[in-house]
Amino acid sequence: MKLSTTPAQDGFYFPAEFQPVSEVWLAWPERKDNWRDDALPAQETFARIANLIAEVTKVCVAVCSHNFDRARQMLHSDVRLVEIPFNDAWMRDIGPTVLVNQAGERRGISWQFNAWGGEYNGLYDNWQQDDLVAGSVCDIIGIDYYRAPFVLEGGAIHTDGEGTLYTTEECLLSPGRNPQLSKAQIEEQLKVYLGIEKIIWLPNGLFNDETDGHVDNLMHVIAPGKVVLSWTDDPSDPQYALSRQAEQVLKSQHDAKGREIEIVRLPLPGPLHYSEREANGIDASSGMSRQAGERLSASYANFLIVNGHVFLPMLDEDTDAIAIDILQNAMPEYQIIAIPSREVLLGGGNIHCITQQIPA
């Protein structure tokens, strides 16, 4: 049921990803102008990711009706399939952000969605079905939800679950999101809808990220007061300056509880680029650039934390083991599950972007 109040009025807040999770949602990829070769390689990768997460917690996958049978064949029998229409398969951004209160009750938020920029720089023209997905998911899992009065995607925000929110100016202040709102007004809306006390604004996201710099591709919150940050030591890499800007902001701030923020540098893979074969397998589109030789916005920070497990993208044989080692040292109590996920990267994101956790 759609509510007319706000989370702040009702005492609900945004919990951290590393807190207990009851289920994880994905959507089944099919767009031929985003996923190569009729989306078949992407479907294989999505299925592998969903099946591995299903060994840890309940998994639900939204699928359009014409792909139901194929998805059912590829997914484990304990993965629930639900027919929900959508325009593309980025559940982090089109699904609900689910809040909790002190009594353990849950409520969702249906953000307004405009395909990462609307008429200004959106990636496709028709996002009407995407904009309804969050409400549908809330109805299916049986929770009430708020309809937020502004545009936001789940990949644009990270939290420590203790009052601190991390985001980027590049995304939230983009003219394609909420040009009618000032930065101060956006802060106020985030506090009202997410129950947070402090917002840490990083200047930019990852280089060439077509979401206008989602924070979940740049960094991840792995514990209260502790983050991993995508990093390169190559001065010729455009990301070199961007990561240092982000680190300087993080070093200069304290979180909502007054803690200094511990930063773990997580090296970037690559740089990685579209191959000619990969680019040629994607249908032409006016909104999405998929050209041979174009740099991919690749990051190991785009992982998912679920109940003591980290589902980590594997992207480059030269750096995969380094990323695993750094994360395992930073998160010794977690089991890291490494999953080759280049096919998700080719579509413009990675494991965190295609999943949305529901708090327990």
Curated annotation (Swiss-Prot):
GO MF annotation list: agmatine deiminase activity; protein-arginine deiminase activity
Record: active site: 353 (amidino-cysteine intermediate)
Substrates-to-products reaction catalysed: agmatine + H2O = N-carbamoylputrescine + NH4(+)
InterPro entries per UniProt: Agmatine_deiminase, Peptidyl-Arg-deiminase_porph
Keyword ATP-binding attributed: no
Bilayer-crossing regions: none
Disulfide partners: none
Biological process annotations from GO: putrescine biosynthetic process
Keywords: Hydrolase
E.C. designation(s): 3.5.3.12
Family: Belongs to the agmatine deiminase family.
NCBIfam families per UniProt: agmatine_aguA, PRK13551.1
HAMAP family reported in the protein's UniProt record: Agmatine_deimin
Name of the molecule in the record: Putative agmatine deiminase
Organism encoding this protein: Vibrio parahaemolyticus serotype O3:K6 (strain RIMD 2210633)
